[in-house]
Swiss-Prot record:
Belongs to the KTI12 family. GO terms for molecular function: ATP binding; calmodulin binding. Interacts with the elongator complex. Binds to calmodulin in a calcium-dependent manner. InterPro entries: KTI12/PSTK, P-loop_NTPase. Coiled coil: none annotated. Residues 262-275 are annotated as: Calmodulin-binding. GO terms for cellular component: cytoplasm; elongator holoenzyme complex; nucleus. It comes from Oryza sativa subsp. japonica. The lineage of its organism: Eukaryota, Viridiplantae, Streptophyta, Embryophyta, Tracheophyta. This is Protein KTI12 homolog. It is found in: Cytoplasm; Nucleus.
Length: 301
């Protein structure tokens, strides 16, 4: 139905805005599904997630992946994070466009001095905060949204330090109206993004890749289990999967729970790698080769 990107400096009132928006949306209609995606919902700490550029990039990848899995035409997803880089907001906009849903940005425009003060007060209360050096770094790299950019539009602006943030705030009400208004041929003030052929093809290709990887890795697991059962519990050193495919080399017997755990980890790693590199293999043989190489390394180590 919609994707809402919360944007602002650290400690600018974003989480309060996300909570108020979600509550106002749920109050507007009883059959609406609203979900907030943030670092804490994924068990990620603030300082650990922003301590350097590598982990920050990984954080954005994890959040983007979770948004990609969650967006649909039946729910409203609220991304409560810094979303401080315009290129990243563009990526989120592309996800909304590929899903054919509404999109908007809710910007918490809070002066840096107030953000710093709120961060200090949280430290005094023992609440989760940003270390001072991390806070200063994030502030210096913030890219303010611009409503002239399609990925920053429509833009709803809140001023938490001046007006506070409440469920009844006029800007919250305006955003709720935009997100829930019924759209017909006469509607002009609400824009539902339309997927392009390119985005539809990309999502289909990714789905096919994940299907092939899931299928191929399960077949490898089945082959190992069958070979070990035929060996009556004795170690099976080598398992052939057929011509032009690598041989599975086992130094010991491997139980089904361990095999399942290795398979889950492999699929997770392949998905994370595809966020910054090439997509997962689209054919079964390539997926099989990758998984067998991974198993041979992990089991022999």
């Amino acid at each position: 139905m919609a994707l809402v990107v919360i944007c602002g400096q650290p400690c600018s009132g974003k989480s309060a805005a996300a909570a108020c928006l979600a509550a106002a949306l749920c109050s507007s209609t009883s059959d609406l599904t609203v979900r907030i995606i943030d670092e804490s919902s994924l068990h990620l700490g603030r300082n650990d997630s922003y301590k350097d550029m590598v982990v920050e990039k990984n954080l954005r990848g994890v959040l983007r992946s979770e948004v990609d899995r969650s967006v649909s035409r039946d729910s409203i997803i609220v991304v409560d994070s810094l979303n401080n880089i315009k290129g990243y907001r563009y990526e989120l906009w592309c996800l909304a466009r590929a899903s054919g849903i509404r999109y908007c940005v809710l910007f918490c425009d809070t002066e840096v001095d107030h953000c710093r003060e709120w961060n200090t007060k949280r430290q005094e209360k023992g609440e989760p905060t940003y270390d001072n050096n991390i806070f200063d770094d994030l502030v210096s790299r913030f890219e303010k949204p611009d409503r002239r950019n399609r990925w920053d539009s429509p833009l709803f602006e809140l001023f938490p330090s001046r007006d506070g943030v409440m469920e009844s705030s006029p800007v919250i009400a305006e955003a709720v109206s935009y997100l829930t208004k019924k759209v017909d041929s006469k509607t002009r003030d609400v824009k539902v993004l339309q997927p392009t052929i390119a985005t539809q093809t990309a999502r289909t290709t990714e789905a096919n890749s994940l299907y092939e990887m899931d299928k191929a890795t399960q077949e490898v697991i089945n082959a190992i289990v069958e070979a070990q059962s035929c060996g009556l519990g004795l170690p099976v050193n080598k398992i052939s999967l057929g011509p032009d495919l690598p041989t599975i080399c086992l130094q010991r017997s491997v139980g089904l729970p361990e095999l399942r755990s290795l398979r889950r980890t492999f699929i997770k790693l392949a998905g994370q790698y595809s966020l910054s590199g090439p997509p997962p293999p689209a054919d079964a043989d390539s997926a099989t080769r990758m998984f067998v190489d991974y198993l041979n390394r992990e089991i022999s180590s």
